[in-house]
């Protein structure tokens, strides 16, 4: 005979170790199984109760499911109560055993004993499946009109479960619901309101059936607010706050986008807002729901101001939860009436000093929404003060928002530059990458403030050179506007003593030298320093030139390849007759607009591009399109190599194109004038060959076929021409040096100059080529399997170079589980060249809650003749299970 439940609990509690507990549970489970086999009716109820306790401890109890079914068919209420409780805990709606309980539940719902009806409805509402909902729905419709309110309220809650499983049955319950609102029992009204809200949220077309109930709901709410003390419903001095909150929530749904229904609610909402006690938490709950209703429906302006004032009072509350919901609600309604929210600006700013990190975060978001042209100076000053004491987790986001509002609402460019410099000096290395580039673009596009900006940056560098983003911007500006720094004194800022600062060339070089030698200086900052020195060599006097050369020469043997390459190229550039034009001041930098698809969570699926576009008339192709794509940074060759005969022909043609490009830039190709120059050019040629080889070895997926890259083109071309004549060799050596120095500089081609017969024979322009009109950017779905969706956002970044295509791969996950260890690789045919960047993440969140992007650039050497075809290699895991696929993803013919 098994022990009692009380004895089992005492035994388990007295166990000293987990092993001892498992042993006791195993013994008791064995005794329970034995009793089940013997069909011991007296101990069945007690055994199921002990199984429930064992289940709560986390041990398996599946063997007791049939015992629960045997208990619910018993005529005894005590047996049914334990049986239904075991049914709810040991089974769920997916268990096939549950189908055996359908007839028993149907019979118990129609029982004359209200307690048996109650436990059966309770079990049905918790474990009802779709099939069971269809079978027992007629009984629920009957008991929802029962005379006993105890049964009616449970039936209304069961109706919610039925409609969630079978929404088609909604029409059957709407007539029954209207009668429930006429009840005097608050529990019945509360469950009826819950059922109405559920129907409206599931199907918005059903709202029209309940709009006629607005006057009735208003009367119920008015009676609750004006009634006296009711002990059975009073909570904290408020009459039935749960029912009031539920009515306000339903009024919010019925009054949305309905002026007539909203007008009927205005008076009662004003009454609730003014009469509810806000000193207790229960009153604040009603006020919060009332504010949400006022801001959602078509309420009067005065009522909205009252609601915002209530939220302002919430900000003064000592409870962090109330302050948080106030800030959260104000962030949502700030666009409705920003002037009313502005009245509480000081209180919102004070929330930045709150010790609770979540409140500080919400206050920061709200202040960002409150910034306008009239208060930009005040709020930015407060945000800068907060930036001084902000935690590291806030700084990056705060800096980004500060720069956005500064750019959007700045009263003038000078104030904008001062503010961003202040932000960068405070935030240090927490500056996002786009902030320095945006500041450089701002200074470059504002010539009248160039002198002022470079002087401010010089002063900032004198104070602190450990902030790398600020140091890099300062070095860029000093390199571009160093002559203004040492010459123009009219706008020079004052120091702390109010005296004008005199900046000499040696002082500028000293601070760059200090940056070189400082321990915190990164390699990227040293690269900026080398470029800045090279720029200053054409802006400073001859007395400073020797020191600049010495500082650059010190890095010609540096172990860092990038620093060594820059130093060698700049050192060679000093002897070049075109140095002044190459190192001249850059033209104003145009601000690049972000792609409209960036940050979109849902990528629209369009029809296949081949059906979307019509065939267009072809036009002659420009000769220099290939060079524009090469200079744009695409250096990686494809995974295949051509034969040696084709390599020689391609090298000759590319050499002719390189000379044509130089003629377009400088008017004519440079020619040697002495043997000394020839020797220097030969040295330069050897240096560039070494650099090109090093660069090729460091690329991703590089092979021996470099005829598609600028480095390989100049290398092979020079080697071929060394055996022919010195003149062409010198010209092409200088061309290679120029292209190495210019790096990613984008060049605009000019009309082609007349060529000699030999040049025309080597030039590809003697072949017939065509140019298609520029296709518009296009987004389309290319892969959809295992919940993984991949969309391509294709665009042509250069209208005069259709051979270059940018493909932004947007990867989303429609499944319910996250995709981990995601890897995407791409292979292309021989006539294509691809540069594939790393993905933004290797984890793709589920349910379309986020996206991963991976950018690729494709260069088509046979544009207009062969399409772009990418074969992807996908590897990922879902719940630890690996998946792999190799799909082909063609692009439209016009791309």
Swiss-Prot record:
It is found in: Golgi apparatus, trans-Golgi network; Cytoplasmic vesicle, Clathrin-coated vesicle membrane. HEAT repeats lie at residues 130-166, 167-205, 211-256, 301-339, 341-376. InterPro entries: Adaptor_Complx_Large_Subunit, AP1_complex_gsu, ARM-like, ARM-type_fold, Clathrin/coatomer_adapt-like_N, Clathrin_a/b/g-adaptin_app_Ig, Clathrin_app_Ig-like_sf, GAE_dom. It comes from the Eukaryota. Residues 591-687, 706-733, 746-770 are annotated as: Disordered. GO terms for cellular component: AP-1 adaptor complex; clathrin coat of trans-Golgi network vesicle; cytosol. Residues 775-893 form the GAE domain. Keywords: Cytoplasmic vesicle, Golgi apparatus, Membrane, Protein transport, Repeat, Transport. One of its GO terms (biological process) is intracellular protein transport. Residues 604-626, 639-658, 675-687, 706-731, 746-765 have a biased composition (Low complexity). SMART domains: Alpha_adaptinC2. One of its GO terms (molecular function) is clathrin binding. Adaptor protein complex 1 (AP-1) is a heterotetramer composed of two large adaptins (gamma-type subunit and beta-type subunit), a medium adaptin (mu-type subunit) and a small adaptin (sigma-type subunit). Interacts with rhgA. Belongs to the adaptor complexes large subunit family. PANTHER family: ADAPTIN, ALPHA/GAMMA/EPSILON. Subunit of clathrin-associated adaptor protein complex 1 that plays a role in protein sorting in the trans-Golgi network (TGN) and endosomes. The AP complexes mediate the recruitment of clathrin to membranes and the recognition of sorting signals within the cytosolic tails of transmembrane cargo molecules. Also involved in early steps of phagocytosis and macropinocytosis. This is AP-1 complex subunit gamma. It comes from Dictyostelium discoideum (Social amoeba). The lineage of its organism: Eukaryota, Amoebozoa, Evosea, Eumycetozoa, Dictyostelia.
């Amino acid at each position: 005979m098994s022990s009692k439940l009380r004895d089992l609990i005492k035994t388990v509690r007295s166990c000293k170790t987990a092993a001892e507990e498992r042993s006791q549970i195993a013994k008791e489970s064995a005794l329970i199984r034995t009793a089940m086999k013997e069909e011991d009716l007296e101990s069945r109820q007690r055994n199921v109760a002990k199984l429930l306790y064992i289940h709560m401890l986390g041990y398996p109890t599946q063997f007791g499911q049939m015992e629960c079914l045997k208990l619910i068919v018993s005529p005894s209420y005590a047996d049914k109560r334990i049986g239904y409780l075991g049914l709810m805990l040991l089974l769920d709606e997916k268990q096939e055993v549950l189908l055996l309980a359908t007839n028993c539940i149907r019979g118990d719902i129609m029982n004359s004993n209200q307690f048996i009806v109650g436990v059966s409805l309770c079990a049905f509402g918790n474990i009802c499946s779709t099939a069971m909902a269809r079978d027992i729905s007629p009984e629920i419709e009957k008991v929802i009109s029962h005379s006993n309110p105890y049964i009616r309220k449970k039936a209304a809650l069961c109706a919610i479960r039925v409609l969630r499983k079978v929404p088609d049955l909604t029409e059957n319950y709407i007539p029954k619901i209207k009668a429930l609102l006429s009840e005097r029992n608050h529990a019945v009204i509360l469950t009826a309101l819950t059922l109405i809200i559920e129907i409206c949220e599931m199907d918005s077309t059903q709202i029209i059936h309940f709009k006629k109930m607005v006057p009735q709901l208003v009367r119920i709410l008015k009676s609750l607010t004006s009634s006296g003390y009711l002990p059975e419903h009073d909570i904290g001095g408020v009459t039935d706050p749960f029912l009031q909150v539920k009515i306000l929530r339903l009024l919010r749904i019925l009054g949305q986008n309905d002026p007539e229904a909203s007008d009927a609610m205005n008076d009662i909402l004003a009454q609730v807002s003014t009469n509810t006690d806000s000193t207790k938490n229960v009153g604040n709950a009603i006020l919060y729901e009332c504010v949400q209703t006022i801001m959602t429906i078509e309420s009067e302006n005065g009522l909205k101001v009252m609601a915002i004032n209530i939220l302002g009072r919430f900000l003064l509350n000592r409870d962090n939860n109330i302050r948080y919901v106030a800030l959260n609600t104000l962030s949502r309604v700030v666009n409705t009436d920003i002037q009313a929210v502005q009245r509480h600006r000081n209180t919102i700013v004070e929330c930045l000093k709150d010790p609770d990190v979540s409140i500080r975060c919400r206050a920061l978001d709200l202040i960002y929404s409150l910034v306008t042209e009239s208060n930009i100076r005040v709020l930015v000053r407060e945000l800068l003060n907060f930036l001084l004491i902000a935690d590291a987790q806030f700084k990056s986001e705060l800096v980004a928002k500060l720069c956005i509002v500064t750019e959007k609402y700045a009263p003038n460019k000078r104030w904008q530059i001062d503010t961003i410099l202040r932000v960068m000096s405070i935030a240090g290395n927490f500056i996002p990458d786009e902030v320095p580039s945006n500041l450089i673009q701002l200074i470059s596009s504002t010539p009248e403030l160039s002198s002022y900006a470079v002087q401010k940056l010089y002063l900032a560098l004198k104070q602190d050179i450990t902030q790398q983003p600020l140091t890099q911007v300062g070095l860029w500006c000093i390199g571009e506007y160093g002559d203004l720094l040492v010459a123009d004194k009219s706008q020079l800022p004052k120091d702390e003593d109010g005296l004008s600062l005199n900046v000499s060339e040696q002082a500028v070089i000293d601070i760059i030298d200090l940056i070189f030698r400082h321990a915190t200086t990164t390699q990227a900052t040293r690269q900026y320093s080398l470029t800045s020195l090279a720029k200053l060599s054409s802006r400073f006097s001859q007395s400073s030139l020797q020191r600049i050369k010495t500082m650059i020469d010190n890095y010609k043997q540096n172990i860092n390849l990038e620093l060594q390459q820059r130093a060698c190229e700049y050192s060679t550039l000093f002897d070049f007759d075109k140095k002044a034009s190459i190192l001249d001041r850059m033209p104003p930098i145009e601000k690049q607009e972000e792609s409209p698809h960036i940050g979109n969570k849902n990528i629209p699926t369009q029809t296949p591009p081949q059906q979307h576009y019509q065939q267009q008339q072809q036009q002659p192709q420009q000769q220099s399109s290939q060079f524009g794509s090469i200079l744009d940074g695409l250096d990686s060759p494809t995974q295949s190599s051509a034969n040696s005969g084709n390599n020689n022909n391609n090298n000759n043609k590319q050499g002719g194109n390189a000379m044509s490009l130089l003629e377009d830039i400088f008017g004519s190709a440079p020619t040697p004038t002495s043997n000394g120059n020839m020797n220097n050019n030969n040295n330069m040629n050897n240096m560039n060959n070494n650099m090109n080889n090093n660069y090729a070895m460091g690329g991703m997926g590089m092979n021996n076929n470099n005829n598609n890259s600028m480095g390989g083109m100049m290398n092979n071309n020079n080697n071929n021409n060394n055996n022919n004549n010195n003149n062409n060799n010198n010209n092409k050596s200088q061309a290679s040096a120029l292209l190495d120095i210019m790096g990613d500089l984008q060049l605009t081609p000019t009309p082609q100059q007349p060529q000699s017969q030999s040049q025309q024979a080597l030039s590809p322009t003697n072949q017939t080529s065509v140019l298609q009109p520029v296709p518009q950017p296009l987004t389309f779905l290319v892969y959809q399997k295992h919940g993984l969706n991949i969309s391509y956002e294709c665009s042509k970044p250069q209208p005069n170079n259709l051979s270059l295509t940018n493909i932004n791969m947007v990867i989303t996950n429609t499944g319910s589980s996250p995709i981990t260890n995601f890897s995407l690789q791409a292979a292309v045919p021989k006539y294509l060249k691809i540069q594939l960047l790393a993905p933004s993440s290797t984890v793709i969140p589920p349910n379309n809650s986020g996206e991963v992007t991976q950018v690729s650039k494709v260069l088509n050497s046979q544009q207009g003749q062969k399409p772009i075809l990418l074969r992807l290699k996908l590897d990922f895991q879902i719940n630890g299970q690996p998946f792999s696929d190799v799909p082909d993803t063609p692009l439209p013919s016009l791309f």
